[in-house]
Structures are given as structure tokens and as C-alpha cells.
Amino acid sequence: MDAAEYKHVVLGLIFLKYISDAFDERYAELEAEADQGADPEDKDEYVAEGLFWVPPDARWNVLKDNAHQPTIGTLVDGAMESLERENPSLRDVLPKQYARPTLNKQQLGQLIDNFSNLKVGGQNSQGRDVLGQVYEYFLAQFASAEGKQGGEFYTPASVVKVLVGMLAPYKGRVYDPCCGSGGMFVQSERFVEEHKGRIGDISIFGQESNPTTWKLAKMNLAIRGIEANLGRHNADTFHHDLHPDLRADYILANPPFNISNWGGDRLRSDQRWDYGVPPTGNANFAWVQHFIHHLAPNGVAGFVLANGSLSTNTSGEGAIRQNIIEADLVDCIVSMPGQLFFSTQIPVSLWFLAKNRKNGFGQEGRPLRDRSGEILFIDARQIGELEDRTHRVLSDDDMAKITGTYHAWRGDGGEYEDVPGFCKTASLDEVRAHGHVLTPGRYVGTAAMQDDGEPFAEKMDRLTERLTLQFDESARLESIILEHLAKLRTTTNGREHE
């Protein structure tokens, strides 16, 4: 079975294990309170705590006790069906293909054994964190195994962390119109927790067109106890916007790159195209304008686009980019290093737009400086390290370097200064002079060479002497090699005449 199929088997079981553990924990509490009238089989006791009700045939112990029976696939499918029937929010979300003949039932039983031994601790929050990390690990591994197709549901963690760290979503509405498996939302809630904020201060809205990926997102968020409005079903964001009236405080997104079959010919008069009608052959600037359309008056957006969007003039895209720049919406552009994504080797950049750049609020509600008429360019192509031959990752220090530069620049902590080769504040006049091209490399210049203090004349003499010695050594070695070749030739000729 390939990774694309296997992931649903594994992730479905992880989800079932999580909700069963949370259920069992509450069940034990109610049993202990039985003398006070508590009933562990009362569904309302679980719903009131924000937990899923797990009917008897769907409980993990039932599956564990029958893990090596030939009917285990049917039992797991039945458990999933029972969960959906008893919990309306899970309807049509869970995988139900465990009984199919192509699934090795012995391996399925071994998986159940392995997850049964997973130690998640005694507290619900601790269990959620451990299983959430396991779920995230498998998402990343399956994305890597699937390659290009894996990119449809997974954005690398380092990219998500940079986006979230830049926008710092403390309070308000967070929106991702192409949410994949929900990674932006998970990191947003994690950010709030790490900075001692209140989870209830952000509300989450999302949309996903792929039905399978939409289900992954629902399970991923449920495992972590994250409430989100992803709509009642999957839907195409361009043609069936599930949140038409939403004006978000934060938009985080990794839209599919350069898609040509987005149905743009049917949307030529759409109200979202304030800055120009996007070409039917590429949806990049349709996504950008969709984000802008859904921003609140003080909203900010951070998203990933292929580097071509920074400079293209094809099919009117240059004019759209120019109009967005002249509307003073572009706050920051970050060129990212290559090989971050499992799905593509296309170089990417992060765009940050702000609806109101005259003021606004940053981390912990601090007021921001007026950035009107300026754009921050960051060239981060040289940071990060290779995790393996094909994938690069960013360290915490790498990510902090990018996010810290942005926060300092917008007046949100620390002192900002241009760093040749890495970051530069450019005026709109400078951007106009470059033809409204937003490629950071055009603005940041090159890193300053460190002066080692050695006078030029002395360095020139030293290097010339070294080069002369290397030439002499090269000539000596060449002479020895030619001498050996001559001897070899003489010996060979002598043998031929014998």
C-alpha cells in the first residue's frame, strides 16, 4: 500500500485513540463520582466537557481485545460509523475502509497494538499534546513519502512558524481559505499558548477544496481540541466561498502554486478583483486578491507564493502587482531558501500585506509605527541547513532572525537597521524605479566582506608567493608522472617483442 492510502489508515487510528483516551479519562472521573449520582454512560456528561461521545462498540479496548481477529477491519469501520452517528460534527469525516481486502489485517492489528502502548499521560491536555505531535509527525512523513501530492495537505513546519511568528495572531479572527490539514491553525493556537495568551481570544475560519484533505483538517484540529469553522463540507474557495462576509484580522495561507485550471473564465466580473482581473491561466493573483478582499480594516495577511509572482508581467499580472503596491498594501517580502517543500523545488517567497499601515497593533497589543510608503525586503535564501539530500529545514534561530527583523522594523520590539545582503527598507519610489518588481535580491545588495586587517600589498605578495610554490609543485608532480608513464611504456613494449 502506498503512502497516500496508508496515511488514512494510520491517521484514522490516531484520531480514534485520542478521542478514546479523552473519553476513558472522563469515564473514570464519573465512575469515581457515582455515589454523587454521576453516570459514566450519560452522553451529556461528555458533550458538556467538549468531548466526543464514544459508543461501546467504538471504544479502544474493544479494538485492542480483537486486534488479531480476522474481523478487525470490519470492527474498526463499525467504530468509525458509530462515532459519526453519535457525533454530528464528525459526520462524513472519518475513514471507513479498514475492511477492504487489500488492507493487511495482520499489520492493522500490529498498528492497534503499537498505538495501545502509546503513553499519553494522565491528563487530557498532556494526552492531547502527545497525540497531536504524533499526528503532526505522521502528516510530515506522509507528505515526504508522497512528494508532490503531499504538498496538497502539508506545509513544512518551519514555513508555518515563520508566517505565524511574523503576524503574531493574539486576538481576533484567523482565516485560511486553502487550509490543507490545518497546520496554520495549529501553530496559531500554539503561538497564543506560548505567549501566555488566551485560546478563546482567537476564532478560526477555514476552507479546503479537496474532500480528503478537508477530513484530515477536521481530525487534526479535533485531536488538539481546536474549535474551527471549516464549513459543513469541502468547497472551492473561488467558486463557492463558504465565508463570504468574513473580514479577518489575520490571514495565513499556502495556496497551490501557479494553478491554471481554477475556472477563472467564469469569474471575469467577480467583486474580489479590485486590482485587476487575474489571468485564467494562473491563479496566483486571484489568491492574493481573495486575501485582500477578506481582510478587516486593520487586518494583516501572510502567505506563500512562487517567486515568479514577484516579477512576472505575463497576462496582466505585473499590472495587478503594481496596483497592489501603489495601494500601499505590501508590508514585507521574504525570499525563502530552496528545498523547504516536499511538493516542489520551485523557489518561494512570503508576502505580508497590511490593510492599514499607518498604525495598527502588534505583539501583546503594542502600537506599530507608520510604515506608509515603505516596504521591508528580507533575503533569507542563505539560511537553514539540509536535513537530507533534498529537504532543508530552518532552526529556531533562523526563524527568529526573520521574525525579529520584521517586528523591529514595524516598531514592535528591538531596533531595526538595514543589513547588506539580508534586509533593506525600500521606499515606493525605489520600487517604482525597479518597475514594481518585488524580488528582495534587487534591494538588499550583497553582504559586506569582513576586513581581516591585512594590508593589500602584503596580502598580494603572500598570495603570489603561495601561487608560485603551487605552480612549482605542480610542475614537479607532472614530471614524476611523465617519467613513470615512460617507464611503463618501455616495459610494455619489451613484453610485446618477447
Identify the residue ranges that each predicted region occupies.
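Non-catalytic, mostly N-terminal accessory regions of nucleic-acid modification and defense proteins
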Residues: M1-Y170, N229-L242, S335-G338, N356, ...
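Conserved S-adenosyl-L-methionine
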Residues: Q149-A253, N258-W262, L267-S269, D274, ...
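Short, contiguous acidic/charged loop-to-helix segments that flank catalytic cores in large enzymes
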Residues: W262-N282, G308-E317, P337-S343, R389-L394, ...
